[in-house]
């Protein structure tokens, strides 16, 4: 179901869900009987076709860079604590987190034994032998920082005073016989963990860029009890020994960031919610302009393989409408792209200075925060295929690729041939490229409208 109301007047920090309609309590419920948040692993039995093991290395990378050096100079930020919390919430909502809460951090919130992702150690060993092939500005600094983070032992965070807690809602469970869903069966918790860790890792780095100490905590690596923090931050209620949300039930994942930045805290949810909150028009119809009971999950009424948008209504043609003289299209080296040319000074010293060390990215704190994780992911862009080839028909492979990409949050996926002229002739190091693949998977992400760039047409 599409949106019926506009959200143009809804502040970004309030998020998609009408959480302001939920009743709050001045007192926190008893948390003694609350079960710990489950420790999550990304392993599957040998021979499984699940996508979850392929996600493990990315989760480990985020767990590896969840902490890092803090800027020695504290940036100028709002003195009003509520304004600070609103800014950080808006950042998380811009990254598509479902709900965000802020709470204080007490000694009871720490785990007696911190959880550590066992994949981080294996990843550290693998990275010591991998080489990057990119000329991305400042990649040398990113790699040095990454190796330092891998080698460093996490210190105590008892000086942290508050926590930002992130809730990631589950999508519909794929049907066992659903086309395109062979790879994503029983992967809801891992999907939520991956998406939550992404925002937590970036936001923790953002706080460190601003000069405040911060550390991310995920379902696989954490120093704090996520269940307790979720209740205190007003993201969940206590139901027996489990967590529950008035609208989502138990279908969500959690991540958090602890920090020493002073913030304004949210109140816990009341144990009993009024009917006006559970059956309000804001929740049922989305009158507030955001997510509603009927549209918060686009796949409630669509198969994953079809995507969230009605692509089936678009007209298709056999060949592109733009003419391409394929036999005469020249292949050019990677060195000719504008980022490489800027670094080598082809466009003058001023542009070269802006590209040095990735300054054009680092000059904005949010971009600098995102850049660290993006640079770390560069090392995971390639890898060795499994020795055993799994037989799968082209039609089924195409369906599974689309189904998996949409399940993980991509907005549009297309499959096509990948002709030789679409490849660079040489990589960033000058090594000739012999095209190894003849097929391409193209994916685009909706950039949204919250920034001027997205609102001015560069929205994908």
For each predicted feature, which ranges?
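Iron-sulfur (Fe-S) cluster-binding modules
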Residues: 1-129, 159-161, 270-417, 437
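Catalytic cores of enzyme domains
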Residues: 98-278, 391, 395-398, 402-460
């Amino acid at each position: 179901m599409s949106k019926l109301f506009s959200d143009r007047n809804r502040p970004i920090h309030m998020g998609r869900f009408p959480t302001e309609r939920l009743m709050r309590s001045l007192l926190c419920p008893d948390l003694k009987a609350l079960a710990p948040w489950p420790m999550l692993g990304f392993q599957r039995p040998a021979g499984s076709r699940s996508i979850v093991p392929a996600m493990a290395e990315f989760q480990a990378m985020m767990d590896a860079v969840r902490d890092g050096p803090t800027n020695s100079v504290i940036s100028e930020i709002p003195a009003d604590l509520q304004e600070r919390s609103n800014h950080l919430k808006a950042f998380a909502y811009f990254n598509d987190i479902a709900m965000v809460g802020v709470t204080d951090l007490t000694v009871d919130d720490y785990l007696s034994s911190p959880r550590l992702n066992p994949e981080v150690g294996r990843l550290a060993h693998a990275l010591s032998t991998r080489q990057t092939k990119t000329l991305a500005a400042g990649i040398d600094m990113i790699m040095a920082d990454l190796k330092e983070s891998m080698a460093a032992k996490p210190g105590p965070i008892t000086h942290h005073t508050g926590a930002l807690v992130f809730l990631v809602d589950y999508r519909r469970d794929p049907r066992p016989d659903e086309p395109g869903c062979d790879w994503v069966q029983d992967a809801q918790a891992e999907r939520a963990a991956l998406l939550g860790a992404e925002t937590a890792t970036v936001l923790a780095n953002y706080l460190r860029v601003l000069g405040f100490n911060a550390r991310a905590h995920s379902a696989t690596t954490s120093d704090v009890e996520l269940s307790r923090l979720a209740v205190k931050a007003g993201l969940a209620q206590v139901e027996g020994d489990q967590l529950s949300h008035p609208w989502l039930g138990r279908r969500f994942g959690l991540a958090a960031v602890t920090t020493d930045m002073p913030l304004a805290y949210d109140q816990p949810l009341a144990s009993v919610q009024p009917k006006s909150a559970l059956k309000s028009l804001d929740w049922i119809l989305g009158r507030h302009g955001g997510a509603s009971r009927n549209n918060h999950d686009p796949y409630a009424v669509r198969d994953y393989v079809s995507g969230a948008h009605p692509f089936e209504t678009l007209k298709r043609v056999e060949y592109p409408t733009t003419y391409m003289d394929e036999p005469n299209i020249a292949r050019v080296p990677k060195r000719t792209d504008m980022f490489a040319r800027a670094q080598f000074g082809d466009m003058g010293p001023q542009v070269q200075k802006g590209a040095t060390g990735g300054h054009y990215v680092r000059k904005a704190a949010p971009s600098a925060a995102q850049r660290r994780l993006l640079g770390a992911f560069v090392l995971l862009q390639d890898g060795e295929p499994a020795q055993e080839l799994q037989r799968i028909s082209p039609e089924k492979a195409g369906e599974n690729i689309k189904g998996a990409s949409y399940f993980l949050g991509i907005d549009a996926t297309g499959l096509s041939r990948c002709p030789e002229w679409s490849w660079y002739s040489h990589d960033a190091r000058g090594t000739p490229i012999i095209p190894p693949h003849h097929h391409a998977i193209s994916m685009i992400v909706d950039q949204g409208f919250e920034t001027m760039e997205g609102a001015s047409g560069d929205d994908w």
